[in-house]
């Protein structure tokens, strides 16, 4: 095996796994630190936000309302997280990888060609856009709710909550470029202590008021809906805050595998969350004034400051998981053709999944700070939280229907009964959250809408661009047929021409012949393709075909979670009999200047957006890791 092939094999090891096989305990601890940060910090604000609705009219909260909300929270955790995600959706892995885009690719693969694939793609894009909208809110509400614990211990610190939260958030984003390998080692133990402590505090409160366990019955949720009707429906919009982060269980399967995530949820996280929520309920039944901040008032006075510090650490971990997820999602969107090329920096020599995307990091920092300074408290931010989460739930359910029907062979009746129930439940949560739009729910919708416009405009623009290239290009077969009779001067060396379509002559080659009137003695037509799976298999990755003497067609395939590295992969061609030294070849690129045509084929606002993104896209040389001193760029003006 060549050095290049060995490096390629090393980069294809499962993400997040070191060279040695990690033990089950290590993987379980890792899952605690990465997967459950968001849902694990929900007790800081979810239960309080739900109960506050019953105080809006000045009335006193009664036992039924406490029991009803607890019942809703518990059964949401059971039905949405445990049944839907852990038992069902996590079965639909794409070669071990999860997440909305992996599920979209899987659904498109088993769907019939045509409009169905298009709409499945749109569903996946909507889910991805909502994920980014959620990613802006999660760090803001999590860090704010943790720092607000200072008010309980030191009331004089109230005016410092906002500055402290802002400093924590800025510091979190400013260290992203260094990666998370060092911090990641302590994430698991910190979250293990977090879940142990919040579960223990909840248990102690339950022991003082054991009747609160009656709320385990779903009957109390039903009674609340019957008695309060519209108000109970509104409360659902806050109850869903208890299950934010459920999507992470599925999205992070590629890092840890399904089994450690399921074990961590069933053995540690679900029991700890249940105990803490019911402990908060017991405390409020004992003292209604505890509603000011039931999570921190559950903690003994002497432990509150350490608990604030631990909560801040836990919310930073939750935010870090969301930020890392946004980086990974952005890379997948680029690879799948939904966003322009971005700078992707690897922050670890051993773990492929640890990346840093500067553009995404800056956008998230600006968005999170804007939310913190605008909404100012976690209670206010709770109104903006939930729409993106429930929208993602709906998108996941729609895509799962196709996978379970087509790939797993479920009967139409089984799919309708099982996923019809969850579609109804998710729709109730989503509809309830839509009522939050005037209070702040518009935030994730606006963010998601902007991203949706960007993704669809970029995808449509690239299709138009490819169509225009095909119109103006020469079929490769015709070019090769004329090559032996041509009087083109051949010069020493190897030239690599990148082309989006392997059956047509690259525009850069035609421009090179037009202006320089020479052709290298060895020519490679290189096409890079992205597969609908996380990683390309050894038999898929590299394809070589000799079209004529010293003229080759090379196709390199990457999975949507892989980062392209063309020089490395070209070195592997030597094992296929192609004498190529990647650092001694010339790479020819067509640097297109895209302009509006006389009769644009897309709306002007979409065209403007596409042109802006195209001009700000990372150069192909940087994206494909090609040394700039080996590149020849030839300008091409392309009207669309």
UniProtKB/Swiss-Prot annotation:
Alphabetized UniProt keyword annotations: Cell inner membrane, Cell membrane, Ion transport, Membrane, Potassium, Potassium transport, Symport, Transmembrane, Transmembrane helix, Transport
One GO cellular component term: plasma membrane
Q: What is its main location?
A: membrane
Classify the protein's membrane topology as the record does. Multi-pass membrane protein
The record's subcellular locations are: Cell inner membrane
Transmembrane residues, as ranges?
A: 24-44, 69-89, 124-144, 155-175, 186-206, 230-250, 265-285, 307-327, 355-375, 384-404, 415-435, 440-460
GO function term, MF aspect, one: potassium ion transmembrane transporter activity
The answer to keyword Cell inner membrane applying to this record is: yes
Q: Which reaction does it catalyse?
A: K(+)(in) + H(+)(in) = K(+)(out) + H(+)(out)
Question: Family per UniProt?
Answer: Belongs to the HAK/KUP transporter (TC 2.A.72) family.
Protein function: Transport of potassium into the cell. Likely operates as a K(+):H(+) symporter.
Entry-linked HAMAP family:
Kup
Please report the name of this protein according to its UniProt entry: Probable potassium transport system protein Kup
Q: Which organism is it from?
A: Granulibacter bethesdensis (strain ATCC BAA-1260 / CGDNIH1)
């Amino acid at each position: 095996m060549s050095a290049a092939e060995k490096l390629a094999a090393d980069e294809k090891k499962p993400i997040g796994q070191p060279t040695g096989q990690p033990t089950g305990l290590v993987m379980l601890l890792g899952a605690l630190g990465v997967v459950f940060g968001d849902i694990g910090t929900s007790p800081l604000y979810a239960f309080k936000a739900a109960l506050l609705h019953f105080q809006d009219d000045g009335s006193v909260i009664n036992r039924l309302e406490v029991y009803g909300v607890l019942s809703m929270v518990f059964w949401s955790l059971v039905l949405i997280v445990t049944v839907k995600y852990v038992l069902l959706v996590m079965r639909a892995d794409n070669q071990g990888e999860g997440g909305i885009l992996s599920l979209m690719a899987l659904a498109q693969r088993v769907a019939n060609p045509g409009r169905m694939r298009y709409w499945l793609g749109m569903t996946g894009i909507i889910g991805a856009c909502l994920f980014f909208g959620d990613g802006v809110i999660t760090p803001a509400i999590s860090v704010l709710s943790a720092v607000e614990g200072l008010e309980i211990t030191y009331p004089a610190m109230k005016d410092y909550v906002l500055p402290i939260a802002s400093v924590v958030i800025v510091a979190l984003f400013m260290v992203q470029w260094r990666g998370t390998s060092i911090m990641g080692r302590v994430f698991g133990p910190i979250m293990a202590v977090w879940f142990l402590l919040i579960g223990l505090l909840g248990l102690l409160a339950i022991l003082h008021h054991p009747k609160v366990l009656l709320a385990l019955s779903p009957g109390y949720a039903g009674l609340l809906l019957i008695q309060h009707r519209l108000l109970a429906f509104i409360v659902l919009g806050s109850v869903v805050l208890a299950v934010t982060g459920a999507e992470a269980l599925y999205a992070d399967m590629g890092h840890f595998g399904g089994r450690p995530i399921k074990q961590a949820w069933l053995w540690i996280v679900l029991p700890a969350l249940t105990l803490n929520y019911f402990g908060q309920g017991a405390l409020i039944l004992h003292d209604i004034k505890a509603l000011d901040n039931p999570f921190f008032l559950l903690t003994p006075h002497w432990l509150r400051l350490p608990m604030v510090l631990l909560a801040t650490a836990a919310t930073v971990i939750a935010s870090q998981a969301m930020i890392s997820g946004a980086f990974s999602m952005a890379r997948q969107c680029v690879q799948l053709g939904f966003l322009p090329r971005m700078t992707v920096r690897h922050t670890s020599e051993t773990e492929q999944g640890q990346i840093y995307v500067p553009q995404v990091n800056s956008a998230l920092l600006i968005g999170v700070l804007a939310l913190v300074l605008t909404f100012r408290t976690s209670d206010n931010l709770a109104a903006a939280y939930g729409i993106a989460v429930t929208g993602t739930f709906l998108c996941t359910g729609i895509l799962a229907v196709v996978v379970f029907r087509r790939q797993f062979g479920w009967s139409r009746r089984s799919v309708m009964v099982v996923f019809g129930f969850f579609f109804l439940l998710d729709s109730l949560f989503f509809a309830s959250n839509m009522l939050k739009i005037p209070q702040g729910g518009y935030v994730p919708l606006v963010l998601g809408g902007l991203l949706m416009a960007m993704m669809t405009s970029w995808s449509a623009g690239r299709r138009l661009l490819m169509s225009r290239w095909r119109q103006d290009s020469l079929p490769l077969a015709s070019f090769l047929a004329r090559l032996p009779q041509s009087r083109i001067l051949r010069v020493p060396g190897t030239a690599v021409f990148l082309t989006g379509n392997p059956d047509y002559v690259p525009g850069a080659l035609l421009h090179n012949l037009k202006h320089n009137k020479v052709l290298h003695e060895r020519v490679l037509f290189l096409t890079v393709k992205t597969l609908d799976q996380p990683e390309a298999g050894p038999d898929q990755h590299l394809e070589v075909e000799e079209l004529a003497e010293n003229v080759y067609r090379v196709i390199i395939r990457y999975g949507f979670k892989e980062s392209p590295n063309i020089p490395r992969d070209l070195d592997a061609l030597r094992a296929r009999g192609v004498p190529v030294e990647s650092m001694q070849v010339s790479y020819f690129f067509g640097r297109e200047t895209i302009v509006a045509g006389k009769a644009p084929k897309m709306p002007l606002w979409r065209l403007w957006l596409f042109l802006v993104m195209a001009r700000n896209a990372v150069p192909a040389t940087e994206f494909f890791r090609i040394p700039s001193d080996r590149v020849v760029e030839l300008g091409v003006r392309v009207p669309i």
